């Protein structure tokens, strides 16, 4: 790929297979930077027969010549980061002088995680829980907005960090009544001890990453931006309130990494060939029959972070068109097309029809509030399947005609060229069109 700066973002509710494309391309880039999310997201990658599970670390970490960055839009649970680094080390991945963390990235503390679990459990009693991963991401971003959160750069001045963590700990415990006073003191002491040990392992990696990335770009080096979660989970534009607490869309890269908006970026959207979702929230094309069982089984649809079974359904092109409208993707990677090889017929949602009036929702629009999803029903186009193993095919022309037609229909509907097609679980199982 000749473009100097490339961005990859998911077009659904996450789990689109972004990690596979990032991993495939990042070996050709000098720097890979993650701009949002935390250890709530997850990539499961298969490279040369080895399975790698990543949560916080960018996918570029698997290639020895690639520098990796966690930007200021990422929230970092330090213990999880250290564990992830250690796990990769055991698999032969050396991140020495290859991982850098923004001084401005906010820290996720165990107390944030406790608050997250408490809120989910309380809401669950009233059937109002969001279905979060309970990783503390929401409470961390909440304290960030309240200006009581703590940036990782504060740990470079330990005395000041102790004061900030003490203040935050007692404030959160008081507001949420999570612990007694004695438990709070014990938690604070434990957190200080853990963070002193863990921070000593990555202190030299904490830098001004915004400056670093801009320098790479000015020097003409190739830079790759990796988004976490998916566009329909965006705090502002997703299926609110069943969303994450950060900006997951293409526009999030500018704040999440401190990038000049005049930088020319090739924007790549990753779209799974069918629809999945973890946790609660609207899902117009969700399946509950044998087709769900097939998608879930052959697609191995379990959350990498939580292990929860993913909800599955037919591809929702109404949602994808909505995402394309505010994202402006230049190219698309259609992932996991091979999973649909199990079906005699395949459906795609092309419109939402109002249940009372029969009126179709205008193309490019998407419901804003949860109650509106109940007012519409999906309109499907049925296409014939191909019932052929496509995992060994290397060119578009080798695909069965019905598979080609499926790809071309999506391409025409969205008005974006589908450049990559995922045909198997290995990183290299990918058709690249020209």
Swiss-Prot record:
GO terms for cellular component: cytoplasm. One of its GO terms (biological process) is 'de novo' AMP biosynthetic process. This is Adenylosuccinate synthetase. Plays an important role in the salvage pathway for purine nucleotide biosynthesis. Catalyzes the first committed step in the biosynthesis of AMP from IMP. Binds 1 Mg(2+) ion per subunit. IMP binds at residues 15-18, 40-43, 133, 147, 229, 244, 308. Its EC number is 6.3.4.4. Pathway: Purine metabolism; AMP biosynthesis via de novo pathway; AMP from IMP: step 1/2. It catalyses: IMP + L-aspartate + GTP = N(6)-(1,2-dicarboxyethyl)-AMP + GDP + phosphate + 2 H(+). Pfam families: Adenylsucc_synt. Substrate binds at residues 304-310. It comes from the Eukaryota.
